[in-house]
Amino acid sequence: MRILLLGYGKMGQLIDQLATGQGHEVVGNIHVDNREELTQYNKDNTDVAIDFSQPEAAVENIKWCIDQGIPVAVGTTGWLDDKEVVDTYCKTKNGTYLYASNFSIGVNIFFKLNEYLAKLMSGQEGYDVRTKEIHHTSKKDSPSGTSITLAEGILQHLQHKSKWVNEETDNPEDLAIISERIDPTPGTHEIIYSSGVDAIEIKHTAHSREGFAKGAIAVAEWLRKQKGIKKMDDFLESL
């Protein structure tokens, strides 16, 4: 598989290393200092792109891939205010892309567990819920895309919660996301339901970035044969 990397930070470099080790060819890596080289890539020399760039570059990157007919797996977060525009563009151009706030298989299982627990807790009185995340200090978005996905999974089942807020809150209708940035943490997420008599907690801890990178490569392998706007659920159902 011929992979074009859009963004070449820590995740891009790790994907490069792992993909090459798996026998794939990384045909190029595009970053802020060599963006003019993007024009040399097209669907004849590139099978799929993986985007771990910056929020301000993601939309342009996705549209470029769609224009070139190159499927793109997008792990960049912080650009979702423009997702509806990108979705419309993809449909109009008959393109292919998949956005995921997290490509780790373990985290996506955690997403499902979170939704199931929220459904179980929806009829339980006396419990309040909050979420907590810890990431490395170079993590630019707060809360993380993963935390937002977890919060949305809770909100769809708990009718007494109306929105998430990225702070401690005394408003019973708000779901608190507490964000901490501590090196060298790759990523920890906790969901805590607490009452006067007990507490129920679920937690996911990433020991390294490798799970995210391996997941992105696996998704890219699958996505190159797909068409349209895809989700991680579509990929997981294919396993």
Model feature map: region roles:
Residues 2, 6, 10-43, 123-239:
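C-terminal substrate-binding/catalytic lobe of Rossmann-fold NAD(P)-dependent oxidoreductases
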Residues 26-28, 69-76, 96-98:
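Short hydrophobic/aromatic-enriched beta-strand-loop microsegments
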Residues 31-35, 76-80, 103:
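Short, acidic/turn-prone active-site loops that include or flank metal/cofactor-
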Residues 39-40, 59, 63-67, 111, ...:
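Amphipathic, non-transmembrane alpha-helical secondary structure
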Residues 41-42, 48, 55-75, 84-86:
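Rossmann-fold NAD(P) dinucleotide-binding segment
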Residues 63, 76-97, 108, 113-117:
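Rossmann-fold NAD(P)-binding glycine/threonine-rich loop
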Residues 71, 86-104, 121, 127, ...:
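Rossmann-fold dehydrogenase core element
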